[in-house]
Amino acid sequence: MERQVRVSILWLVLMVGGLVHTVVEVMPLFWGESIAAMPQNEAQMHGMMAFSACFFFVLPGLGQLCTLYACKRWCAVLNAVLAGVMLLLNTSHPIMDLPGALLAQWFILPLVFLFNVILMVEVVKACRRKETHSCCAA
């Protein structure tokens, strides 16, 4: 399979992993349990929502765009930086979240971390080879 396709699929898997993580977190609502996080103020709540949106959608979305449509070397480097930031966040989040998390998160978060490590390896290999994507050949 072509590296561009593999990297694109891995970015999508990270996005889906974030969605599955979120869905599992809200599942206790079906049994009438409260899942409300109590921020200290409204600004903190908006900050948490903005961070979550960036973490689960914007970073992988930019990585996806770099993978599919960008053919320059700096885009490959940006893709590696985005994958590295995601890896850092996917490393720290389970450390903070797992001790009090639902049992299902113990399966989801390590798997998302594993996919992120594979993504990082693929992106770094692409940077080292300086390979061009199929969109550059035209």
Give the positions of each predicted feature.
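Hydrophobic alpha-helical segments of membrane proteins, primarily the transmembrane helices
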Residues: S8, L12, A50, C54, ...
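Hydrophobic transmembrane helix segments
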Residues: V13-V58
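Hydrophobic alpha-helical membrane segments
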Residues: F55-V58, R73-P94, L114-F115
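Transmembrane alpha-helical segments in integral membrane proteins
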Residues: L59-R73
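Structural signal for membrane-spanning alpha-helices in multi-pass inner-membrane proteins
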Residues: Q64-T67, N90-H93, L119, V123
